[in-house]
Amino acid sequence: MEIKELIKIAESNSWTVTEEEYTNGKGLLFSRYSPAGQDFSISTGPFESAEELINSIHQRYVEYDADSEAYLWLDNEGHGKNGAPYHMRDVLEDMEACEKMIYDLFICYRDAYEKK
């Protein structure tokens, strides 16, 4: 499977994909707005094959911690800051939605890769 095909899959699922340059290779930055309007993105780091790219997306899903991410968007009183929703529950739900967006991207990639 070609990397260009994987980029098209992401773009057809509302992701914006940007190429990134690293000292040890190229990677991709996947960006998309969360339901609450956060400009959410994940970076793959360098990869050399479609399989490595898919594994990188899976790893981002495994490592994503919605609770920790939500905490970053809360002030010292537990309310949203920097444009995040005011209520803690809403911030957490938005971060959980971001986690699901990563998972859904991985599933699209896995399914497409297995069909090839």
What are these regions (language model features)?
Residues 1-39, 114-116:
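Negatively charged, low-complexity tracts enriched in Asp/Glu with abundant Ser/Thr
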Residues 39-116:
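Intrinsically disordered, low-complexity regulatory regions enriched in serine/threonine/proline
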